């Protein structure tokens, strides 16, 4: 196997794809090429780097594009290959042999976008992003009173420093495809996990806020009402925001 010398930026992009599974060219530009004076230059630099990684068989892009063929090269969706994982000296956790379903891809890219928003807030000096765990690193396990092992699977875990305070979040990315009952049941898993005290022992006595990120205001209202009506005194553990208002909501907490 040929030895490939990676630049720091190339290694960072491979590491991102190893963690998030999928990212668009546009997301990669936002994270790693904001030092360009013009958007066109940023995309050209990103495309050159990604093409180099593709030619070395370290990454691939899906056949499907976000926004269709007319959306241009910025709509490519990239993922790391087995060879790319080996270049990072990481075990291969995912096998991207097949094109993902549209729903799975949309959901995964929304998680990546939440990470992009937080990194941009950090670059703007609004927050310090201490930690961001994608799946499965963000997963938690706990046992019921009967000894049954339960898996809690957030979409991500984020730990931020905002001014003098440290905040942590379990992120749930909702695409308005699940029933409200399933949303409520997922919330009840968080309550059960909260009652074990496991996370509080890891987080200096604080349980992370469970942040539901939804596609539009109608879904936000529906989930908010469901949480308030079914979770009794536990509803302050949860917050619902749209993906569009996620950045301003997080950034605005620095002024509280």
Describe each PLM feature range.
Residues 86-132:
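Amphipathic alpha-helical dimerization/coiled-coil segments
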Residues 1-99:
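Nuclease-adjacent, charged terminal/linker segments that flank catalytic cores
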Residues 32, 50-54, 114-122, 190-198, ...:
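Hydrophobic, Leu/Ile/Phe/Ala-enriched alpha-helical segments that form helix-helix packing faces
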Residues 160-256:
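C-terminal regulatory/effector modules of DNA-binding transcriptional regulators
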Residues 20-24, 85, 139, 176, ...:
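Short, solvent-exposed loop/turn segments at secondary-structure junctions
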Residues 127-169, 178-185:
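Active-site metal-binding core of divalent-cation-utilizing nuclease and nuclease-like domains
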């Amino acid at each position: 196997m040929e030895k490939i010398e990676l630049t720091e930026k190339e290694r960072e992009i491979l590491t991102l794809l190893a963690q998030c599974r999928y990212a668009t060219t546009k997301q990669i530009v936002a994270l790693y090429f904001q030092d360009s004076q013009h958007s066109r230059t940023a995309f050209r630099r990103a495309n050159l780097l990604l093409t180099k990684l593709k030619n070395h068989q370290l990454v691939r892009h899906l056949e499907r594009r976000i926004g269709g063929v007319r959306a241009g090269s910025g709509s490519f969706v990239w993922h790391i290959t087995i060879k790319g994982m080996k270049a990072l000296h990481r075990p291969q956790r995912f096998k991207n042999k097949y094109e993902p379903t549209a729903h799975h891809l949309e959901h995964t890219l929304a998680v990546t976008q939440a990470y992009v928003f937080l990194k941009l807030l950090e670059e703007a000096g609004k927050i310090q992003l201490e930690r961001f765990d994608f799946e499965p690193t963000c997963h938690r396990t706990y046992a019921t009173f009967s000894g049954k092992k339960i898996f809690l699977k957030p979409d991500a875990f984020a730990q931020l420093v905002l001014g003098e305070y440290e905040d942590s979040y379990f992120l749930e990315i909702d695409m308005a495809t699940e029933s409200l009952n399933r949303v409520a049941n997922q919330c009840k898993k968080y309550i059960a996990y909260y009652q074990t005290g496991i996370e509080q022992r890891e987080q200096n006595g604080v349980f992370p806020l469970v942040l539901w990120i939804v596609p539009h205001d109608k879904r936000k209202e529906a989930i908010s009402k469901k949480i308030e009506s079914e979770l009794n005194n536990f509803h302050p553990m949860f917050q619902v925001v749209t993906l569009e208002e996620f950045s301003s909501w997080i950034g605005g907490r620095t002024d509280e």
